[in-house]
Amino acid sequence: MSISIEQAIIHEISQDSQGQMRCRLRPQPLLNTHAVETMLEELHQTYSGKAGKGFGFFGTHGDDGEANSEFSDALTGYRKGDLGFVEFSGQASQLLQQELAKYDFSQGGFLLMSCYTSMTSDYLFVALLSAKSSMTVLDDMELSQNNHLDLNNIQLAARIDLTEWQADKSSRKYISFIRGRAGRKVADFFLDFMGCVEGVNTKAQNKTLIHAVEDFVAGSELTKDERQDCRNKVFEYCSERADAGEVIEVKDLADELADSGMDSFYDFACGGSYELDEEFPADKASLRSLKKFSGTGGGVTLSFDGGHLGERVIYDPISDTILIKGVPANLKDQLDRRLKGE
């Protein structure tokens, strides 16, 4: 296993017959059975591989509408040993119940909380899981309907890097969370119950890095191939960091480029007007523009490797046209068939 489980528990939050949200609390942690270990390992892998996560931190409580600190206070109590895990998770469930009660659309679910270690960091994983209906075939070949936890479609989940939180209280990225298909608004109530405030605009930082890289190669004496090699090295470094669950460190990236003969990127990126943080999470979707050009509009979708620009793909901004040399075989076949009237 890639994780070492310390504690895990599940509580249920659901609507009663009067439509009120109620908690059904489990009185003891889950046993570390094979089923529990398999579930948490799967969730860890699924969550770590989710693209486009947001990052934040615990806000402060105040009279001006700032974040509620009850969750972080309870977590602090647990980490100090003042609260047991069951008591802490029960308080968290009550907080989530109170938050869900504010919304008409709330259906509740199963609140899973787990403390575990991965690599050198301790984490608290928090997810609101839903049950999904499925069919199974019994021994007598009759069909039976049952419910199971939908682990492949988690939309309301967050992970707190406890190690970073305790080591650097000024950090603004020790909480990661899934934004959901419709953006952050879907997860507002889930973040609010934890008192989480978004701290790092991951997409903006990644796009700023790309902007800095493009300006850097444009102002250099590198050849066309060397410029693309620089972009590829940046993409590879950032992708490796994303896959490992690590942040992009601009100084570390600059050292990687310097090893390939591309010096001074750190001074260029951090000494200019880019407002680039020293470190920030990677967003692979944004970084793909270092290797590919792509766009969609007016019924046309086009995508090609950046190295083809100026060779197989010629762009003329004056006439607003793109010339493609060497049409892909499968596309050429479709076009030829259409021209022949087939």
UniProtKB/Swiss-Prot annotation:
Pfam families per the UniProt record, alphabetical: NA37 (PF04245)
Cellular compartments per GO CC: bacterial nucleoid; cytoplasm
Species in which this protein is naturally found: Shewanella frigidimarina (strain NCIMB 400)
Xref: InterPro entries: Nucleoid_associated_NdpA (IPR007358)
One GO molecular-function entry: double-stranded DNA binding
Family that this chain belongs to: Belongs to the YejK family.
UniProt protein name: Nucleoid-associated protein Sfri_2491
Compartments, as annotated in UniProt: Cytoplasm, Nucleoid
Keywords: Cytoplasm
